[in-house]
Amino acid sequence: MKIYFAGSIRGGREEEQTYFKIIDYLTNFGEVLTEHVGFKNIDKKEQGSSDTYIFERDVSWLKSANMMIADVTVPSLGVGYEIGFAETLNIPILCLYNPRNKKSLSAMISGNKNLVWKEYNTVEEAKLLIDKFMESN
């Protein structure tokens, strides 16, 4: 199984450690195409890559993915775009949201009946939500 993990990069890296732990867990289910999202200093690692290269690479990964897990705790234009693109490809999508961040979840996520979104407070809770999502997809 190929899994596309989406998390904020340019929109803010407050959840970087959480991304890393979730991505590590997702490797139990298959190949995580976007494991770099959990890396420290990702912005420095991608400095040599043009925006066009990043866009084309990520779209290619989305087209090859069987499933998307998106952490939507930190608002991100890129993550929103990726979710919308994955939706057009009919890829099952799980959006994870941690309310401790105090940032409101976009109605474009919470109101969309074509995707699943769940709140979590700990990484362990997120893992259980992932397990349930994987079982049903």
Indicate where each model-derived feature is located.
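Conserved catalytic or regulatory cores that recognize and/or transform ribose-phosphate-containing ligands
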Residues: M1-N137
